């Protein structure tokens, strides 16, 4: 199937953090529904739409395995099975609380302090699922190399298809596009107040989520969430129906392969 897949961390879709993040971005990546944002008084709707355009398309998430096209010889069902196996072998854990921060000109939710467990999870996702990643096109590699990368980031780009992985990884849930400094400081303070009550407790990391983007400008959709340590066959079947429902919008041939599992 054409399009790109990605493996993300997402908060519990039933929880307040997911609702707040989806509301700010204006879209729920699980349901696909538009969500009415509660904007700060000083922020107009046109400016908000511009500031959140790319984050809204990607959905509220933290990247674990950056977006990739499926390698030749693999089908979506193979990736789903690998996600099941990966999640089944892991246990839930807590990461430090979040905070709203300036990340290289973007506003994002980041951890209050480093987490070895989060870093290990991201590292494992990058390496374990790399066999499913098709090599980037020459144009994609050239575009990435045009950015200001360190020598190490350039080496990571060539090895893993993305420069900000392994020791260059930084856990974050993006809230805005890159912004100019004057407006960024004011909006950061507003968003810190918006998310304040939701960023006081440790973050429960209890699964991974598989997302799919059918075309370059289309939004990423959550195909399925894989709880850590889960052996619940009924939940598995419900989740598989979710995968089938989303993919059925794009390619009936791949739908048949998934639904025959």
Predicted regions and their residues:
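Basic, often amphipathic N-terminal segments
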Residues: 1-103, 116, 120-202, 215-250, ...
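Conserved, mostly hydrophobic/aromatic
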Residues: 208
């Amino acid at each position: 199937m054409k399009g790109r897949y990605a493996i993300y961390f997402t908060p519990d879709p039933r929880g307040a953090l997911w609702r707040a993040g989806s509301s700010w971005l204006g879209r729920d990546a699980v349901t696909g529904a538009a969500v009415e944002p509660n904007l700060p008084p000083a922020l107009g709707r046109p400016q908000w739409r511009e500031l959140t355009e790319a984050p809204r398309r990607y959905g509220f998430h933290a990247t674990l395995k950056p977006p990739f096209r499926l390698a030749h010889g693999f089908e979506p069902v193979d990736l789903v099975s690998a996600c099941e196996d990966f999640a089944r072998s892991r246990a839930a854990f807590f990461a430090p609380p979040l905070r709203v921060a300036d990340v290289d000109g973007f506003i994002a939710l980041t951890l209050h302090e480093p987490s070895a467990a989060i870093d290990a999870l991201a590292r494992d996702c990058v390496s374990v699922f790399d066999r499913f990643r098709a090599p980037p096109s020459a144009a994609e590699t050239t575009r990435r190399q045009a950015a200001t990368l360190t020598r190490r980031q350039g080496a990571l780009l060539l090895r893993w298809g993305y420069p900000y992985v392994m020791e260059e990884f930084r856990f974050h849930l993006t809230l805005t596009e890159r912004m100019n400094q004057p407006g960024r400081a004011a909006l950061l303070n507003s968003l810190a107040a918006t998310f304040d009550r939701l960023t006081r407790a440790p973050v429960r990391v209890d699964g991974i989520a598989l997302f799919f983007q059918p075309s370059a400008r289309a939004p990423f959709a959550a195909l399925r969430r894989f709880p850590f340590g889960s052996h619940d066959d009924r939940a598995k079947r419900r989740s598989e129906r979710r995968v089938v429902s989303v993919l059925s919008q794009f390619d009936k041939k791949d739908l048949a392969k998934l639904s025959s599992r």
